[in-house]
Curated annotation (Swiss-Prot):
Probable electron transporter required for biotin synthase activity. It comes from the Bacteria. Belongs to the flavodoxin family. MioC subfamily. InterPro entries: Flavodoxin/NO_synth, Flavoprotein-like_sf. Residues 2-141 form the Flavodoxin-like domain. This is Protein MioC homolog. Its cofactor is FMN. Gene3D superfamilies: 3.40.50.360. GO terms for molecular function: FMN binding. PROSITE patterns: FLAVODOXIN_LIKE. Keywords: Electron transport, Flavoprotein, FMN, Transport. SUPFAM superfamilies: Flavoproteins (SSF52218).
Length: 144
């Protein structure tokens, strides 16, 4: 099972999550999307695909903040967890993709195994982030 965990303010990360979920299902993977992620509802094993934008001064969107805080405050045993992170941002800000980069580092710090490097999508270059995310998934799908 691939748990797709989104952090979104305006819906862009949710759209990317929906699109990647469809593509993964077409390849035979089981997926579950968590647009309001809750640590108690997502097992710390299998695969997590975190897709998040960055809000304000490098912060997480409101919907994913409690999930990230739970990971930081009471990290679960992640020895059986693999993860990938897609970070969506705007390179005209100095906090470009800060939330996604932090999530990637946090998961590694608490013992989860990365499937790929943190993938950043610059909306200045990719106004439709689903397209960039799809190209990335095609490159790394064999790692899932």
């Amino acid at each position: 099972m691939i748990h797709i965990i989104t952090g979104s303010t305006l819906g862009g990360a949710e759209y990317v999550g929906d699109h990647l979920s469809d593509l993964l299902q077409e390849q035979g993977f089981d997926t579950k999307i968590h647009n309001q992620p809750n640590m108690s509802e997502i097992p710390a094993k299998g695969t997590w695909l975190i897709i998040t934008s960055t809000h304000g001064a490098g912060e997480y969107p409101d919907n994913i903040q409690p999930f990230i805080q739970a990971l930081q405050n009471t990290p679960p045993n992640t020895s059986a967890l693999r993860y990938a992170v897609v970070a969506i941002g705007d390179s005209s800000y100095d906090t470009f993709c800060a939330a996604g980069k932090h999530a990637y580092q946090l998961l590694g710090d608490i013992g989860a195994k990365p499937l790929a490097n943190c993938f950043t999508i610059d909306v200045q270059e990719h106004p439709v982030p689903e397209d960039a995310a799809e190209a990335w998934l095609k490159r790394v799908i064999n790692r899932f």
